[in-house]
């Protein structure tokens, strides 16, 4: 079965007893001055944490020359103009024709490109990285080049790459759940998305090219500084059909578990707290005709159950990989028809090879990142890809996060199931003893996700309101912070431009007793946005990172378009940033420090 290939990435971890959902206190080894930061680090006595003031413009912009502040103001003001934004692509084209490419590129470097992009190649980005590092701000390196496709071309590529051979010839039509079926109305995944890069599958050679670019990005991260990050998207590494099919498998298998939980009177419980009685579960599966009682008893052994004697969702999920010989039994009941349906789809030989190469590319990147001492951040994507992306990331974490978290998963807190996803992954890391690495974001695909769910006809996966998303973000973050109070085997990045969320994090860190020097909590913002948050944090000793894209001017124009649109979509934050920039320029004029030189 083709999906077994997924788990070649995994090195089997020893099974220990199931734990509760609450982080449990653990005895820590004595602290030593030489202790490394992060996973496995011992916590030593630390100096007091300086107060962080996001209104002190002198400190916030200490790293910037006055002309840079003027450029920032100009760019942010242009991003606030609805007329300019509505026609910015046409304006770019006109400017390029009038000025010529050379002068156009120079103009872009003086404005939008210079504000949002670090440079054209690995050498040209080094001065900015060194400069920011001197003021306490690290980097997440990202090769920002994208294909500039027409909507029609993007739709054609998406339909071809997300449809299996069986679906094309009619034998596999409509087998997947609605959410995981490709739909022509949403073939252009860029539509309605303003803050995330999008890749479209062309062929295996193109995926190899992306991998080589990412390897160069990892090399640059390792050479530029210690402790850097690189970011990757799994849709750049292979045919998205596999991600859709695997996501469908994982979702249906999880839903089957919750159906049986409801039969045992456990409907509505948190996912990590739902535990099924083994004997009742075995009876239910046998009555459905999935397998004989004798076969089923072989599934649930002390090795898989620990000492709990019950089956939770983590035990249940493990059947797909650790018990792959049971693949012929992986069927689930169709609620509408009452019939048993196979869970795993059939792949052609070519499709299986494409999937295998995708997994190999992931493996190559993870190995290279670990060798270079670079942490690899797996970006989140659309909800119909995300179950597969999260599971593949988890398999990489099991293998590479033994001593410290090199692989970070991204959790989108606008999803209704975000808290379940965070708690389940954290629990699995505890049980198996590997290091948990997470980036928490609100999410980049909200408008597209809502429209798609309504149009195709499945439950909206997004929280109903912005306030509900904020509450979910803080709930997930608080859970991870409570874990950090007792364990050094986890790290979290608070990737947010929301000042209230950053304040919440700082307050909880102080209450819990987490020191910034321990390096377990870090912050992330985009280059060119929210310097008034990033630099005060960095100068106070908190680990903070800028998401730093690079690439040739003409090839990062799609990225620049999204940055302009994103600034317009978060007007409250951008307006505050403009006010602070004006305030600092007036202060410099008033005090005679207009020619301020950062030092």
UniProtKB/Swiss-Prot annotation:
GO terms for cellular component: mitochondrial inner membrane; mitochondrial matrix; mitochondrion. Its EC number is 1.5.5.2. It catalyses: L-proline + a quinone = (S)-1-pyrroline-5-carboxylate + a quinol + H(+). It is found in: Mitochondrion matrix. Pathway: Amino-acid degradation; L-proline degradation into L-glutamate; L-glutamate from L-proline: step 1/2. Its cofactor is FAD. One of its GO terms (molecular function) is amino acid binding. One of its GO terms (biological process) is proline catabolic process to glutamate. Residues 23-39 have a biased composition (Low complexity). Its main location: mitochondrion. Keywords: Acetylation, FAD, Flavoprotein, Mitochondrion, Oxidoreductase, Proline metabolism, Transit peptide. It comes from the Eukaryota. Expressed in liver, kidney, heart and to a lesser extent in brain, lung and muscle. Gene3D superfamilies: 3.20.20.220. Residues 153-180 have a biased composition (Basic and acidic residues). Residues 20-39, 152-180 are annotated as: Disordered. The modification N6-acetyllysine is found at residues 356, 367, 485. Converts proline to delta-1-pyrroline-5-carboxylate. Belongs to the proline oxidase family. It is linked to Pro/re mice that have a premature termination on Prodh are sluggish in their movement. This is Proline dehydrogenase 1, mitochondrial. The gene is Prodh.
């Amino acid at each position: 079965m083709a999906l077994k290939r997924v788990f070649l990435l995994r090195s089997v971890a020893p099974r220990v007893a199931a734990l509760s959902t609450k982080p449990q206190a653990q005895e820590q080894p004595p602290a030593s001055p030489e202790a490394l930061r992060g996973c496995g680090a011992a916590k030593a006595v630390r100096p007091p944490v300086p107060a962080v003031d996001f209104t002190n413009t002198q400190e916030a912009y200490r790293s910037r020359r006055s002309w840079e502040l003027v450029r920032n103001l100009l760019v942010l003001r242009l991003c606030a103009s609805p007329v300019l934004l509505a026609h910015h692509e046409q304006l770019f084209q006109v400017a390029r024709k009038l000025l010529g490419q050379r002068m156009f590129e120079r103009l872009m470097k003086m404005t939008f490109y210079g504000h949002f992009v670090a440079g054209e190649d690995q050498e040209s980005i080094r001065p900015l990285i060194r400069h920011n590092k001197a003021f306490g701000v690290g980097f997440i390196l990202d090769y920002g080049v994208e294909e500039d496709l027409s909507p029609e071309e993007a739709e054609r590529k998406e339909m071809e790459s997300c449809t299996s051979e069986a679906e094309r010839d009619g034998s596999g039509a409509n087998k997947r759940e609605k959410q995981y079926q490709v739909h022509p109305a949403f073939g252009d995944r860029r539509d309605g998305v303003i803050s995330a890069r999008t890749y479209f599958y062309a062929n295996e050679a193109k995926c190899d090219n992306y991998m080589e670019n990412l390897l160069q990005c990892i090399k640059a991260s390792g050479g530029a500084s210690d402790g850097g990050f690189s970011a990757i998207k799994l849709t750049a590494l292979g045919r998205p059909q596999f991600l859709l099919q695997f996501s469908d498998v994982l979702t249906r298998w999880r839903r089957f578990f919750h159906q049986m939980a409801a039969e045992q009177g456990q409907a509505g419980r948190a996912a990590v707290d739902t535990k099924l009685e083994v004997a009742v579960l075995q009876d239910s599966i046998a009555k459905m005709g999935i397998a004989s009682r004798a076969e089923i008893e072989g599934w649930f052994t002390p090795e898989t159950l620990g000492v709990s004697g019950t089956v939770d969702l983590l035990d249940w999920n493990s059947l797909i990989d650790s018990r792959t010989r049971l693949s012929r039994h992986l069927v689930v009941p169709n609620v509408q028809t009452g019939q048993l349906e196979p869970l795993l789809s059939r792949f052609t030989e070519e499709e299986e090879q494409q999937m295998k190469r995708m997994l190999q590319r992931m493996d190559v990147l993870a190995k290279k990142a670990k060798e270079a001492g670079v942490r690899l951040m797996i970006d989140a994507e659309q909800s119909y890809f995300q179950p597969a992306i999260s599971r593949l990331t988890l398999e990489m974490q099991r293998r590479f996060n033994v001593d410290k978290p090199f692989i970070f998963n991204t959790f989108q807190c606008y999803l209704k199931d975000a808290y379940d996803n965070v708690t389940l992954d954290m629990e699995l890391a505890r049980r198996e003893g590997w290091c948990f690495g997470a980036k928490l974001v609100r999410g980049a695909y909200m408008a597209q996700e809502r429209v798609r769910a309504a149009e195709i006809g499945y439950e909206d996966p997004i929280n109903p309101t912005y306030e509900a998303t904020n509450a979910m973000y803080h709930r997930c973050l608080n859970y991870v912070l409570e874990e950090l109070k007792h364990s050094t085997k986890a790290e979290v990045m608070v990737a947010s431009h929301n000042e209230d969320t950053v304040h919440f994090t700082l307050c909880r860190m102080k209450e819990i007793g987490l020191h910034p020097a321990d390096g377990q909590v870090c912050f992330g913002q985009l280059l060119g946005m929210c310097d008034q948050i990033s630099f005060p944090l960095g100068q106070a000793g908190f680990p903070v990172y800028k998401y730093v894209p690079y690439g040739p001017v003409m090839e990062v124009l799609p990225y620049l378009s999204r940055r302009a649109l994103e600034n317009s979509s978060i007007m409250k934050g951008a307006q505050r940033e403009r006010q602070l920039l004006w305030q600092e320029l007036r202060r410099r004029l008033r005090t005679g420090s207009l020619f301020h030189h950062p030092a």
